[in-house]
Design a protein with these regions (language model features):
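Conserved C-terminal beta-signal and adjacent last beta-strands/turns
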Residues: 20, 237-239, 276, 323, ...
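Extracytoplasmic beta-strand/coil segments of soluble accessory domains associated
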Residues: 57, 72, 89-136
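Short acidic/polar hinge/loop motifs at secondary-structure boundaries
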Residues: 135-164
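Transmembrane beta-barrel wall of Gram-negative outer-membrane proteins
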Residues: 221-297, 318-333
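Face-selective signature of the C-terminal outer-membrane beta-barrel domain
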Residues: 276, 280-282, 319-511, 594, ...
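Structural signature of Gram-negative outer-membrane beta-barrels, strongest in the C-terminal barrel
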Residues: 278, 413, 428, 432-436, ...
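Membrane-embedded beta-barrel scaffold of Gram-negative outer-membrane proteins
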Residues: 331, 342-363, 539, 545-555, ...
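Gram-negative outer-membrane beta-barrel transporters
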Residues: 423, 488-495, 504, 598-601, ...
Length: 798
C-alpha cells in the first residue's frame, strides 16, 4: 500500500519525463530493428498504418461498421450538419436506444440515457462512456461518473461514433450502455480557414410564436432580442509541409435558452497538432480550454406550466464550469499484417483539470406555490416541521422565507493518466489473430467544497453563512487488459474473447475549514474488479453478418452528493451483465439493415431521483433495435429506426409512499424504470441536388413514468418541510411527442478554395408541446421542452 502511494506521487510529478524517455527508447529500438530493410519496410508500413487507422468510421458504409460484432451507429458529418440538428443532444436523438431529455436547447449539459438506464442519479448523464477523440471527458471517470461539465460544442464536431455492445475490455467501467465517441474536426491536408455564425430564434411567447401578443406595438428588435442564441465559430488548420500540421478552433456561444431569463455563455478553444516523424512514427497532441455559465429555470407546477411554460420561477438554479484538457499520443506502425506479422504500438498520456459550481436554493425540490401566489391543491398528508409551519406559503425564491437556504456546490477534478497499448497481428493465411493488450494507470484528485447561505433574520442562523464542510479524494486505478480476435477463413467466422482487470484505490480526506470539535479523518479503500467479454461474428456471405456479444461492466463507488439532497454517492459496485445478438445486411451499397436484441441485468443499481430511497435495486432491461439506411438514387438518403425497451425492477425494494410519508412503504417489484420511453421512432432523410441539400429529421417518444410507483395521472403531493429543506413531490406520466425538424443548406458562392455556405432550419416545426420531469435541474414538477425555433447559419471557407 505504501509503495503505491509513492509511485502515485512520482507519476504526478515525473510523468512528462517518463513519457519522453519511454517514447524515445521505443522509437530508437524500432528504428534500429528495421534499419536493414528500410527500402522495403516503408512501403509495407504505409499499408499497416491504413489498416490500423485509429480514426472513427466516417459513416455507416465504413468497413469498421460493416464488420462490427456489436450494434453500431455513426452520425456522419452530413447527417450531423444538414438534417436539422440544433445541438449534439439533437444529433444523438438519431441513435436507436439512446434517449435524450433536452431541457435547455443550448446543448450545455446533455441528459442522456441508454437502453433503459441513466434517467436517475442527479440527472447528469451517468450511463455510457462518453469520449472525445477517444479520451474520457467525465470529471472523474471512475469515482464521479456524470457530465457535470461537457466540454464540447456543436460547431467543433465532425461526426459521432456510437457502439452499444461488447466494449468493456477496451474502455473499462460504465460501458454497459455503450460508448459515445465524439470526433472533432481533424487537421486537413491542405490549409483552410473558416468563419461562421449561427443564430437561433426561440418561439417562446405565451402562444408559442416569436412575438408575444402582450408585446404588440413594441419594436421587433426589442421583442426578439431576449430570445436569441448566438453561436460564433472560427477555425484555421492545415499541414505545414509533409510532417507538421496544426489546427486552431474557437467557438463562442452567447445569448438565451428557450426559457425566460436563462442567459448562457460558452467559450471553447481547441488546439491540435500532428508531427509525422516518418512513415512509421507519429506524434499527436491537443490542448483545450472550455468555460461556460448558464441558468436552468427547472420545473414548474402544473398550474404555472399551463399559464406559461416558458417562465422562470427558479432564478437561483445556475451552474458554471471550466475545463483545461491536454493530451499527447505517440504511435508506431510495424510489419505487414496482410502477410505474417504487423501492427501498431500506441502510448497515450492525457490530463484534465475541470471545475464546476452548481448553485440552487432549498426550494430546488419544490413546486408548492404558483406564480400567481396561490397555494396549490395537494394530495396526501405531507409533513410540516413545527419550527417552520409557514414555509410553504412563500414563493420559490423568496429570501424572506424562514426556510430559505442557498447552496453552492463547488467541485474540482484533476486527472492524470497514461496508457501503452499494442495491436499485434499474426497472419498464417487460414487464421488471422489480432492481439490487443495494454495497461492504463489513472489518478483522480477530487476537491469538494459546499457552502450554505440562510435567512439571517431567523434565530440560530447567525450571519446567514455556513462555510460547510470540505472533503478531498485522492484515488488511483490500474487496469490491465488483453483480447484476441481470432479470424477464420477471411472473416467468415470471428471470435474475440477478452478480459480487463482493474485495481481501484480510494482515499478520502477531510479538509479545512473544520467544524468545532471535528476530528479530521482519512479513509482508504481497496477494491478490484474484472470485466470479461466475448464477441462472435459469422458471415454466411460477404455482406451479411450475424453477431453476438457478452460483457460484464460496472459502476464503481461514487462520490457525488449535492448539498443535503440525494446525489449519486454510493459505497458499493453496481454490476451489469449485458448480452446482445443481431444481424447486419448490406445490399449493393444502397441498403443497410441492422436488427438486434439486447438484455441488461443490473445488480445494485442506484435509482437516485426515482424516489427518496437511497437503496439500490436490481433491474432488467431488454429490447429490440431496428435500423435501416436506404439510398434509392444518387443524392437521396433515408434513415429510419425503431427501439422497443422493457425495463423492469426485479428486486423487492420498499419505498416511501409520498401520499403518506409516515405510512407503510410500498414494494416496487415489477415496476417499470422511470424516464424510459418503451417505444422510440427515428426518421430522417436528405436530398442533395447540385449545391443544395434539403434535410429532414424526426423523433418519437412514447409516454414514460416519472416515479418508481408508476403513477399515471399527474399528481402534486403535500409538501414536506424538514431541516430547512422543502420537498413537494410530483408524479405522473409524461406525454408522448413526435418532433420534426427541417433544414435547407446551400453553397451560395464558390471560387477555387473559397466558398460561402448558408442554411436555414426550423426545429419542432409543428410546435409540439411536451414536458419532462425535471431531470437534473429540479426533480419535481413539469419542465418544458424546446418550442419551435428558427436557426440561420452562414459560413465562409477560404
Amino acid at each position: 500500500m505504501r509503495k503505491v502511494i509513492i509511485m502515485n506521487s512520482y507519476l504526478r510529478v515525473k510523468t512528462p519525463y517518463f513519457l519522453a524517455l519511454y517514447t524515445l527508447t521505443f522509437w530508437t529500438f524500432n528504428s534500429f530493428m528495421g534499419a536493414k530493410e528500410q527500402h522495403h519496410f516503408l512501403k509495407k508500413v504505409t499499408t499497416t498504418e491504413q489498416k490500423f487507422n485509429s480514426s472513427a468510421p466516417l459513416s455507416y458504409q465504413s468497413e469498421e461498421v460493416r464488420n462490427s460484432t456489436s450494434s453500431r451507429t455513426v452520425i456522419s458529418n452530413k447527417e450531423l450538419k444538414k438534417t436539422g440538428n440544433l445541438n449534439i443532444e439533437n444529433a444523438l436523438q438519431n441513435v436507436p436506444g439512446i434517449q435524450i431529455r433536452d431541457a435547455t436547447g443550448t446543448g450545455v449539459l446533455p441528459k442522456i440515457s441508454v437502453r433503459g438506464f441513466g434517467g436517475g442519479g442527479n440527472g447528469h448523464s451517468n450511463t455510457g462512456m462518453i469520449l472525445v477523440n477517444g479520451i474520457p471527458v467525465y470529471g472523474a471517470p471512475y469515482s464521479n461518473i456524470e457530465l457535470a461539465i461537457f466540454p464540447v460544442t456543436f460547431q467543433s464536431v465532425d461526426r459521432i461514433d456510437v457502439i452499444k455492445g461488447g466494449t468493456s475490455v477496451q474502455y473499462g467501467p460504465n460501458t454497459f450502455g455503450g460508448v459515445v465517441n465524439v470526433i472533432t474536426k481533424e487537421i486537413p491536408k491542405e490549409w483552410e480557414n473558416q468563419a461562421a455564425e449561427r443564430i437561433t430564434f426561440w418561439g417562446r411567447s405565451s402562444n408559442g410564436n416569436f412575438v408575444d401578443p402582450k408585446e404588440k406595438g413594441k419594436p421587433l428588435a426589442q421583442t426578439l432580442g431576449n430570445q436569441m442564441l448566438f453561436n460564433t465559430y472560427g477555425r484555421t488548420a492545415g499541414m505545414l509541409g509533409k510532417y507538421i500540421g496544426i489546427s486552431a478552433q474557437g467557438n463562442w456561444i452567447n445569448g438565451q435558452g428557450f426559457r425566460q431569463n436563462s442567459p448562457t455563455k460558452v467559450q471553447n478553444y481547441l488546439l491540435d497538432a500532428i508531427y509525422k516523424i516518418n512513415a512509421t512514427n507519429t506524434f499527436k497532441a491537443y490542448y483545450q480550454y472550455y468555460q461556460y455559465n448558464s441558468y436552468h429555470p427547472g420545473t414548474l407546477s402544473a398550474q404555472d406550466y399551463a399559464y406559461n411554460r416558458f417562465i422562470n420561477e427558479r432564478p437561483d438554479n445556475q451552474d458554471g464550469g471550466r475545463a483545461k484538457r491536454f493530451g499527447i499520443v505517440y504511435q508506431n506502425y510495424f510489419g505487414d499484417p496482410d502477410r505474417k506479422v504487423g501492427g501498431d504500438f500506441k502510448f497515450t498520456y492525457f490530463t484534465h483539470d475541470m471545475s464546476r459550481d452548481f448553485g440552487f436554493s432549498n426550494q430546488y425540490q419544490s413546486v408548492y406555490m404558483s406564480s400567481q401566489n396561490k397555494i396549490l391543491p395537494f394530495k396526501g398528508k405531507g409533513e410540516i416541521s413545527a419550527t417552520n409551519p409557514n414555509c410553504g406559503l412563500y414563493s420559490y425564491s423568496d429570501t424572506n422565507s424562514p426556510c430559505w437556504q442557498f447552496f453552492d456546490n463547488i467541485r474540482r477534478f484533476v486527472v492524470n493518466a497514461f496508457e501503452p497499448k499494442l495491436n499485434l497481428v499474426v497472419n498464417t493465411g487460414k487464421v488471422k489473430q489480432t492481439f490487443n493488450m495494454g495497461m492504463r494507470f489513472l489518478t483522480e484528485d477530487l476537491y469538494r467544497r459546499s457552502t450554505t447561505r440562510k435567512n439571517p433574520s431567523v434565530p440560530n442562523n447567525g450571519s446567514g453563512f455556513d462555510a460547510g464542510t470540505s472533503l478531498n479524494n485522492f484515488n488511483n486505478y490500474t487496469a490491465v487488459y488483453a483480447s484476441d480476435e481470432i479470424n477464420f477463413n477471411n472473416g467468415m467466422l470471428t471470435i474475440t474473447p477478452g478480459l480487463r482487470y482493474t485495481f481501484l484505490n480510494y482515499e478520502k480526506k477531510d479538509a479545512p475549514p473544520f467544524k468545532e470539535g471535528q476530528v479530521p479523518k482519512t479513509i482508504k479503500d481497496r477494491y478490484n474488479q474484472y470485466n470479461p467479454a466475448v464477441n462472435v461474428g459469422y458471415k454466411p456471405i460477404k455482406d451479411w453478418l450475424f453477431y453476438f456479444n457478452y460483457q460484464r461492466s460496472y459502476i464503481p463507488p461514487q462520490f457525488s452528493n449535492i448539498g443535503n439532497f440525494v446525489g449519486t454517492s454510493t459505497d458499493y459496485f453496481q454490476i451489469f451483465n449485458v448480452m446482445e445478438g443481431g444481424s447486419r445486411y448490406y445490399f449493393n451499397n444502397q441498403v443497410s439493415f441492422n436488427a438486434n436484441y439486447f438484455v441488461i441485468f443490473a445488480n445494485n443499481y442506484f435509482t437516485g431521483r426515482y424516489g427518496d430511497n437511497k437503496e439500490p435495486v436490481n433491474a432488467r432491461s431488454q429490447g429490440v433495435e431496428l435500423e435501416l439506411y436506404y439510398t434509392p438514387i444518387r443524392g437521396l438518403n433515408f434513415h429510419a429506426a425503431y427501439t422497443f425497451i422493457d425495463a423492469n425492477i426485479t428486486s423487492h425494494t420498499m419505498v416511501t409512499n409520498p401520499a403518506n410519508p409516515k405510512g407503510p412503504k410500498k414494494d416496487i417489484f415489477g415496476k417499470k424504470l422511470p424516464f424510459v420511453s418503451p417505444h422510440q421512432f427515428i426518421l430522417d432523410a436528405s436530398y442533395t441536388y447540385a449545391k443544395t441539400t434539403i434535410g429532414l429529421s424526426s423523433f418519437f417518444y412514447s409516454r414514460t413514468y416519472t416515479d418508481v410507483l408508476n403513477t399515471v395521472p399527474f399528481t402534486q403531493y403535500a409538501p414536506t418541510i424538514k431541516n430547512g429543506a422543502i420537498t413537494t413531490k410530483t408524479a405522473g406520466m409524461t406525454p408522448w411527442y413526435w418532433v420534426w425538424n427541417l433544414q435547407i443548406s446551400s453553397t451560395l458562392w464558390e471560387r477555387k478554395k473559397q466558398s460561402v455556405n448558408a442554411s436555414l432550419q426550423v426545429n419542432n416545426i409543428f410546435n409540439m408541446k411536451y414536458w419532462f420531469s425535471g431531470i437534473g435541474t429540479s426533480p419535481n414538477g413539469k419542465e418544458a421542452a424546446p418550442p419551435r425555433s428558427i436557426t440561420a447559419y452562414v459560413s465562409y471557407h477560404f
